[in-house]
């Protein structure tokens, strides 16, 4: 079966990763030791996409946990599902990257990367037919962004034909953890544009908004945010983990979602989002799910798709859903909001169905959108980047690790190019094809 190897790097990546494993273990009927106690054949049928069956019926996640300091790892190991993971797959340094991309990418991280690759290789060899990798990390810190992108490029070299999906927590406009976030994020995006096949952008601020507005939590903790992210990750991977009518794998998803190779940064959403304890008071319908799923307030990245247009999007419905009803709803959305979809890609909404709903819900839907409005996010980071870079603020932390200013300039211009590519396709219409055909090759010659 088509296996996926999961890699989590840095503090943020490990916390999201831990929440993800907790969620999908529950969906597959595994307890915190990886022992199966479920009731449905469907839970077992594709278990091996994410789990390796060890002896005595224990299922072990195909997960590699990486960090440059032991703290987060110890927390994962001591957490509710700490006994699930293979002990050899915890790889950590002692020094920490100190929110410095250069440390994660060039010095501290580079020392550890070979150990990590050995473990990844071993996991990959245990697969019948490896489909690809997924990485959870944040772009604002040092380890997840610097070492995460280093791992991605190394894996790319070694497994050039496998898919690479990343769940990347991007810095948010108002909530900032560190001053140098714009540097770390820009340097990471520079790598992701080249090396990732699909990047799901998640943003803490949007998650805070969802927690406060929709889930009515007065002061959300990271646990609540991670719960949202794991719901989306579980939704995106649902077609890979359960047999369904319309199955997709990472590659099919990419084929449907990425019209131009560099434009693979997706916005994600999830429905129904109800406050814990409220969902038992109402039944959810497909029209409601669709409505909520396309609601800007539900997007987990703080850019408003009403300022741009969708190139493509994909919706994944789970539960007992009628195919016909879903298709009608999708057609309905497209007709009502036709201005938000580019007209030069017909049928740009893809739908997938899976009969098994998440725990505690009758139905749910996950949304993945490739919208040109994601450029807002890159623009925002880019402005913060150039404000600091112009004054060479904090630059000595990076040059001290052997980086060159040239790299910063390159990363900045690559990100600006990305923004203008999104803008170009946002404005493109059907009628002006001729001029684009001449321009297009020049755009993508990197």
UniProtKB/Swiss-Prot annotation:
Residues annotated for Mg(2+) binding in this entry: 69
Family matches, as SMART domains: Tubulin, Tubulin_C
Pfam family, one: Tubulin_C
Gene Ontology MF terms in the entry: GTP binding; GTPase activity; metal ion binding; structural constituent of cytoskeleton
Bias kind Acidic residues: ranges: 429-440
Gene Ontology cellular component list: cytoplasm; microtubule
Cofactor: Mg(2+)
InterPro entries associated with the record: Beta-tubulin_BS, Beta_tubulin, Tub_FtsZ_C, Tubulin, Tubulin/FtsZ-like_C, Tubulin/FtsZ_2-layer-sand-dom, Tubulin/FtsZ_GTPase_sf, Tubulin_C
Keywords: Cytoplasm, Cytoskeleton, GTP-binding, Magnesium, Metal-binding, Microtubule, Nucleotide-binding
Ligand binding (GTP): 11, 69, 138, 142-144, 204, 226
Record bears the keyword Nucleotide-binding: yes
Primary location class: cytoplasm
KW Metal-binding (keyword) present: yes
GO terms, biological process: microtubule-based process
Subunit structure: Dimer of alpha and beta chains. A typical microtubule is a hollow water-filled tube with an outer diameter of 25 nm and an inner diameter of 15 nM. Alpha-beta heterodimers associate head-to-tail to form protofilaments running lengthwise along the microtubule wall with the beta-tubulin subunit facing the microtubule plus end conferring a structural polarity. Microtubules usually have 13 protofilaments but different protofilament numbers can be found in some organisms and specialized cells.
Protein's job: Tubulin is the major constituent of microtubules, a cylinder consisting of laterally associated linear protofilaments composed of alpha- and beta-tubulin heterodimers. Microtubules grow by the addition of GTP-tubulin dimers to the microtubule end, where a stabilizing cap forms. Below the cap, tubulin dimers are in GDP-bound state, owing to GTPase activity of alpha-tubulin.
Family: Belongs to the tubulin family.
Protein name: Tubulin beta-2 chain
């Amino acid at each position: 079966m088509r296996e996926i190897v999961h890699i989590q790097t840095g503090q943020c990546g490990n916390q999201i990763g831990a929440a993800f494993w907790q969620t999908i273990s529950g969906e597959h009927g595994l307890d915190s030791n990886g022992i199966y106690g479920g009731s449905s054949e469907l839970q077992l049928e594709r278990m091996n996409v994410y789990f390796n069956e060890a002896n005595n019926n224990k299922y072990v996640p195909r997960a590699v946990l990486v960090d440059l300091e032991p703290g987060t790892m110890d927390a994962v190991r001591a957490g509710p599902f700490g006994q699930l993971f293979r002990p050899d797959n915890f790889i950590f340094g002692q020094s920490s990257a100190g929110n410095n991309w250069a440390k994660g990418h060039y010095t501290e991280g580079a020392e550890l990367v070979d150990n990590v690759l050995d473990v990844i290789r071993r996991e990959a060899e245990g697969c019948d037919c490896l489909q690809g990798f997924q990485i959870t990390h944040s772009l604002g810190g040092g380890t997840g962004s610097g070492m995460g992108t280093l791992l991605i490029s190394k894996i790319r070299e070694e497994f050039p034909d496998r898919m690479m999906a990343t769940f990347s927590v991007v810095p948010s406009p108002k909530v900032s953890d560190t001053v140098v976030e714009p540097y770390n994020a820009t340097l990471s995006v520079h790598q992701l544009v080249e090396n990732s096949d699909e990047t799901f952008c998640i943003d803490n601020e949007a998650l805070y908004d969802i927690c406060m507005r929709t889930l009515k939590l007065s002061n959300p903790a990271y646990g609540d945010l991670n719960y949202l992210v794991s719901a989306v990750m579980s939704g995106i991977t649902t077609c890979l983990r359960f047999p369904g009518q319309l199955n997709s794998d990472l590659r099919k998803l990419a084929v449907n979602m990425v019209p131009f190779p560099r434009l693979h940064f997706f916005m994600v959403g999830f429905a129904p989002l109800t406050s814990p304890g409220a969902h038992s008071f109402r039944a959810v319908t497909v029209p409601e799910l669709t409505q909520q799923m396309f609601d800007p307030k539900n997007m987990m990245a703080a850019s408003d798709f009403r300022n741009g247009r969708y190139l493509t999007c994909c919706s994944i419905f789970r539960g007992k859903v009628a195919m016909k009803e879903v298709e009608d709803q999708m057609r309905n959305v497209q007709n009502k909001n036709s201005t938000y979809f580019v007209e030069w890609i017909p049928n740009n909404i893809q739908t997938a169905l899976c009969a098994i709903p998440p725990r505690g819900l009758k139905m749910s839907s996950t949304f993945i959108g490739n919208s040109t409005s994601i450029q807002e996010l890159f623009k925002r980071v880019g402005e913060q980047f150039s404000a600091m870079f112009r004054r060479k603020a904090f630059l000595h932390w990076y040059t001290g690790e052997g980086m060159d200013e040239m790299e910063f300039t390159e990363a900045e211009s690559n990100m600006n190019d990305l923004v203008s590519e999104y803008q170009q396709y946002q404005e493109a219409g059907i009628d002006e094809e001729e001029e684009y055909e001449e321009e297009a090759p020049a755009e993508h010659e990197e």
